[in-house]
Amino acid sequence: MDSDEQIEVSTLEAYADTIVPGEKRFPDDHAIAGASPGPGAVVAGALELLHTEATGVTVGLPYLAESLNHHAKVYAKEHDLTLDASLPSFVALSFEDRTALVRSLTAPGHPEKDGWVSLALFCNMSFDSAAHKHTAEAIAEGHPGLLAMGYTAPDEDGLWRFPKFSYRRELARIHPDTTPSGSPA
């Protein structure tokens, strides 16, 4: 079996991939199940975001990974599944079984629900908003989640402008005292 750090990383990657699935990075990628085409939460930076101290979950990640593998062993036993002993238990589950286990861990009434939901939210945030990066930096790097949602690069001055109004009309004129940076005077 791998080192504790490798077990933690692959387990958390498998959890992130369960939340926002993506394609395998390489043929023998066990953490990413390959359940969806294109990049998912892992490629979008889920582990980078989870290891950002501002999330408040960083200190608990080793415990969460260990707990997730324990839950996976129990799940496998309850469902008469044989797990590959060379992999962390959660990583060894199929995508369908990972999803079923995460669904039970995040269900109303589960005593650990808050922790698993928090972890899921940060995995989503890594894909949906690139919360671990400045938006312009993420766009310049080709962040997969932002690109999938249609974000475009800012103008040369770093500001986003939209030539077409969402309601097909300008809702308000810019206040005459607005500064060049867009701030009110």
Question: What does each model-found stretch correspond to?
Answer:
Residues 109-185:
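Long, amphipathic alpha-helical surface segments
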Residues 3-4, 8-12, 16-133, 141:
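Flexible, low-complexity segments enriched for small/polar residues
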